[in-house]
Amino acid sequence: MYIFQRNFLYYPFGKILIIPEDFQEINLKTADQTNIYAWFRPAQKGQKTILYFHGNAGNLSGRSDRFEKFATQYGVMAISYRGYAKSEGTTSQDGFFQDADSAFEFLKSKNISSKDIILFGESIGSAVAVNLASKHDFGALVLESPFTSILSIAQKTYWFLPVSLILKDRFESDKIASKVSAPVLIFHADKDYLVPFAEGKKLYELFNSPKRFIEIDGDFHIALSGDYLMKHITEYLQEKK
């Protein structure tokens, strides 16, 4: 279990089959010299940019519909984590955090300020987004089906194992949520079959910045349409002006 635990946490299956129209394919170099694949569509004048961190399964192609919707009102950048489609390296928490840092550095190189960047994290990507948001002052932090930590979920799932002693990648958003200065918007289905609703609600309570929690009636995990997300994100940002 200790040796193979990352095989249970990360599912980087599939190839990049679809690239959204007008998106650029780019390669990033991380601090540890790992090459990371990403998509980028520059923002139009006056638009903010969404920096997107996907969940633990699949790849960017499975989110292409969302990205196309977002691109009608925002610039969009989405990275393929190390170990996932077209990226080098092996999966790990610290590696993912470095991947996110490199994406932010790329946007800065395009003269995009942190306040003009909206971080979006889904599921395990929520922890990547929270980590980055705890270190810089962003325009907003949007999370879909987030959790307090992988440890919290693992303890419920593998209650018969000493997971607190053997878990390598903990993604402990609960320990750094208070450091986030950006406004926070959270979406979570009340009967989410994978990440318990209570996890998202508990994390929400730990943020000290302006925040909103949108509870959705349903038993799904990461299934909201791009239109639905964009509507609520845009409304929330308008209120925070």
Locations of the language-model features?
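An N-terminal hydrophobic leader/cap segment in hydrolases
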Residues: 1-29
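Membrane-embedded segments
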Residues: 31-106, 110, 115, 122, ...
